[in-house]
């Protein structure tokens, strides 16, 4: 454990940030799973609405620098491609 006052504060702030980041990353994983589940279920309309939510969540996480912006862009691109294929099929 830290001994200096500033190090104690830094540790406390890190714990709070970690909790916040974990919550956001969990949400990101869950919305991606929701899109994939809708695609597997064959429901293109549900997949499209889930994609809108996923896009919003991924962009917000990237804006807050919780995930890298290129990771967010890659995930959105791949999910969009999959949803578009499901709609056209």
UniProtKB/Swiss-Prot annotation:
- The protein depicted here goes by the name Small ribosomal subunit protein bS20
Q: Lineage from the top down? A: Bacteria, Pseudomonadati, Thermodesulfobacteriota, Desulfovibrionia, Desulfovibrionales
Entries under SUPFAM superfamilies matching the protein: Ribosomal protein S20
Alphabetized UniProt keyword annotations: Ribonucleoprotein, Ribosomal protein, RNA-binding, rRNA-binding
Instruction: Return the similarity comment.
Output: Belongs to the bacterial ribosomal protein bS20 family.
Q: Would the keyword RNA-binding be found if you checked this record's keyword annotation?
A: yes
Q: Which GO terms describe its cellular component?
A: cytosol; small ribosomal subunit
Q: Which domain of life is it from?
A: Bacteria
- Briefly state the protein's biological role: Binds directly to 16S ribosomal RNA.
State the organism of origin: Solidesulfovibrio magneticus (strain ATCC 700980 / DSM 13731 / RS-1)
């Amino acid at each position: 454990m830290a001994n200096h006052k500033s190090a104690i504060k830094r540790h406390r702030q890190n714990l709070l940030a970690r909790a916040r980041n974990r919550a956001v990353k969990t949400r990101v994983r869950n919305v991606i799973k929701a899109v994939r589940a809708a695609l597997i279920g064959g429901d293109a309309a549900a997949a499209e609405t889930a994609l809108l939510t996923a896009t919003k969540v991924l962009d917000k996480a990237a804006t807050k620098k919780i995930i890298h912006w290129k990771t967010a862009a890659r995930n959105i691109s791949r999910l969009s491609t999959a949803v578009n294929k499901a709609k056209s099929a």
